[in-house]
């Protein structure tokens, strides 16, 4: 959309796959053309944004207006695919900006406590439980399993505790992989 008084006010991208680096460069180019006026870029509904982990702050800055020039990008229902590992905090920021699916690998040093703070349940996060959390509870691992549609790698877990029902539910889940050789501690009384 163009106005003689304000220049370009809105640019709609119809691409179904969008590269974040190219998108940021396009925003910068439009800024040069448009002078001091803010141009809002809208993205095709359901499009996929491919983004490097190092670009998250820039793209979210364009979306929220925290970068000079104000809010210049609307992310609403687009899918976001991240290359590289991201923190739980970045995963939550991305998830909060779209109703689409976020596909990303969570940094392997994130603790179980931090992983449980993932805020959505429909994103495809690749999660590897850290060796620092080798002793875990079935309840915690199941809670993390509920935060992603991808399978969790629990290879580093060597000891699991919980009630009989919690442990049984964990081992019956298809969402947590590489279990089977852990020390198990059942906290409730079992009857035979």
Regions found by a protein language model. Name each.
Residues 1-192:
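Solvent-exposed, low-complexity segments and loops of surface/extracellular structural proteins
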């Amino acid at each position: 959309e163009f106005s003689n008084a304000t220049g370009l006010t809105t640019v709609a991208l119809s691409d179904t796959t969008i590269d974040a680096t190219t998108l940021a460069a396009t925003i910068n180019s439009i800024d040069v053309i448009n002078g001091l006026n803010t141009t809002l870029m809208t993205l095709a509904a359901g499009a996929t944004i491919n983004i490097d982990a190092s670009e998250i702050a820039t793209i979210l800055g364009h979306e929220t207006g925290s970068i000079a020039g104000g809010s210049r990008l609307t992310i609403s229902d687009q899918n976001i695919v991240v290359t590289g590992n991201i923190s739980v905090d970045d995963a939550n920021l991305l998830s909060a900006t779209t109703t689409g699916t976020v596909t990303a690998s969570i940094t392997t040093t994130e603790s179980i406590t931090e992983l449980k703070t993932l805020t959505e349940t429909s994103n495809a996060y690749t999660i590897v439980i850290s060796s620092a959390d080798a002793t875990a509870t079935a309840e915690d691992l199941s809670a993390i399993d509920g935060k992603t549609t991808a399978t969790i790698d629990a290879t580093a877990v060597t000891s699991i505790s919980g009630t009989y029902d919690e442990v049984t539910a964990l081992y019956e889940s298809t969402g947590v992989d590489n279990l089977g050789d852990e020390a198990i501690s059942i906290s409730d009384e079992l009857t035979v």
